[in-house]
Amino acid sequence: AVISRSWLLAQVEKNFNLNGSVTPYKSCYRNNETLIRWYDREDHDLFDVCADDHCQRYQGITRASNPIVREVIKETRGEVLMDNDTICDARFSKCCGGVTEKFENCWEPVPHSSLTALRDDEVPSYPDLTDEREAEQWIRTSPEAFCNTTDKEILSQVLNNYDQETTDFYRWKVEYTQEELSRLIHRKTGMDFGPIIDLIPLERGSAGRITKLKIVGVRRSFTIGKELEIRRTLSETHLYSSAFVVDKKDIRLDIPSRFILTGAGWGHGVG
């Protein structure tokens, strides 16, 4: 209750401040070679939050209310998380993949001291996942983490009923044929890359999530970011996360016949 209340009030406060600002809020930077975009709440100007992913799938209390929930709300009435004089933006993800991501790697480049990189384990140390070699080693293995669990009792406490149907979220794989991937990217971007030659991570965040991805095709190349733009481009809906590595298979004349994406975590990983 305290976390959800803090997140909600932080969004209301942010909207109020943005509406009073003389500088327009920008969530997209584009030129002929690059599109960097993040998704927050710009999809709706007339209300503060919604039930979509960019609003933490906020559903209020009508969809998840019972005597225990009502009692918790009553017992914590008026309580919020604070960062000095500011209400904490207490956003969260389903599974960080072992290390939490920094806010500025997923949204506007404004650091939040309460939304930074932390190891999701009793042991606080972790490798430099902005380094491609370290990130690949991390993603291809299954390090100990609190979110590395298949315990149904634990998952039932933190996931909605429909989310509990997904079990391979700590480490996962997605495979595309050349035809599937090239058609998907063409449809999602509106650009004709021709056959896809490569997907190249140009920049990773603190949790190993790709923040800039270069798509290389026979006809053109283009760089996209941030994490949700990448996830939406490479999936009919969106990938579990942008913390992934790419294996190219059955390469003929420099063109792979298959792409295998091996990934870590579920969601943006922040919080």
Locate each region found by the language model.
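Conserved, single-site charged/polar hotspot
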Residues: 1-271
